[in-house]
A protein has these predicted regions:
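Structured, helix-rich domain cores that form ligand/interaction pockets
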Residues: 1-257, 304-312
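Short, solvent-exposed alpha-helical "recognition" segments
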Residues: 283-299
Length: 312
């Protein structure tokens, strides 16, 4: 589940420590007055930056450990990666502060990945930023992006990088990631989140639960059949019609209704009306969605919930 990490280790007691000697593609400089070294390089797939105050290591755990990055690292694999980094760099990387953390999973799906993007609508606390033929992204925190949720076509990514998928994966592979981009320790309610904590069972389970909770916070649309006998409490024809029409729209189209009206200054100084509009759209869509067969949405919901419920 844990994929990309960014680790920072301070070692102010040794400003002349030459990390570059252990790196590939090493580029270094030295302060001739103090002997302080700084530079960069790579270690397998990891990018390494260092100076007299410390070292920053960033990259994919899966890419570091395995020749094929479609293999999903387990909790124990993270511990192995930290141990290997410590040995290769001759530094106690288990003490490093985690300043970025990505958690993700990918699945074989019934349909191509981009068929699921239109079913994922607005999300609590997140802005739905962009949807392309291969990627859907949500972000929180404005320009600083403290958190990012991303759904993308894993099969195409592997193909573009010239790395075949593992046996068992077909052409329709969808990946969902949650990325904690900043203030990671604070977001998890910890004074300091160090690399050694990443393999702690309680922490790991809480991380996977947050990954699942963020997914659940996304409102879903659908294409489906309706169980008409159960719809007796939908009293108004307009409620049914509006809900069906809204659910037939792509998620981005629904969200753009509010933006279009804001750009046109429809409500003038009555800015609170836009919040009412958004709530009205969500409520009308929800009127009949509980009676629908979700199809692709059900499939994705089940995939995510299965990972959360069976986390090891």
């Amino acid at each position: 589940m844990i994929d990309t990490v960014k680790l920072r280790l301070n070692y102010t007691e040794s400003p002349t420590f030459n990390v570059g000697q252990y790196l590939d593609n090493s580029k270094s400089n030295m302060n001739t007055d103090t002997g302080e070294l700084w530079g960069s390089g790579t270690l397998r797939n990891m990018h390494v930056f260092y100076n007299g105050g410390g070292i920053v290591v960033e990259g994919s755990i899966g890419g570091f450990l395995f020749p094929n990055n479609s293999r999903i690292p387990k909790r124990q694999d993270v511990g192995t990666a930290i141990e290997q980094l410590s040995d290769l760099l001759h530094l106690p990387m288990s003490n490093a502060l985690v300043v970025r953390l990505d958690c993700g999973y990918h699945w074989n799906m019934e349909r191509p990945a981009n068929h699921y993007f239109p079913l994922l609508c607005e999300a609590t606390y997140f802005e739905r930023l962009n949807q392309t033929s291969t990627t859907l992204k949500y972000a929180k925190g404005g320009k600083k992006e403290t958190n990012v949720l991303i759904f993308y076509d894993k099969a195409k990514e592997c193909k573009d990088k010239g790395k075949p998928l593992l046996d068992g994966f077909g052409e329709n592979v969808l990946r969902y990631e949650c990325r904690w981009m900043s203030r990671v320790s604070r977001q998890f309610g910890l004074g300091q989140l160090t690399a050694s904590i990443l393999t702690n069972e309680d922490f790991y389970h809480s991380m996977v639960k947050r990954w699942g909770d963020f997914y659940e916070s996304i409102n879903k649309s659908f294409r489906g059949d309706y169980d008409m006998p159960l719809m007796g409490n939908v009293r108004l024809a307009n409620d049914f019609i509006y809900s069906i029409l809204l659910n037939l729209q792509d998620a981005g189209v629904v969200i753009d209704i509010e933006k279009t009206m804001k750009d046109s200054n429809v409500f003038g100084e009555k800015g609170w009306q836009y919040d009412n509009l958004r709530r009205s759209i969500i409520n009308r869509r929800a009127k009949v969605e509980q009676y629908a067969s979700y199809g692709l949405t059900d499939e994705l919901n089940d995939k995510v919930r299965d990972v959360v419920n069976n986390c090891e």
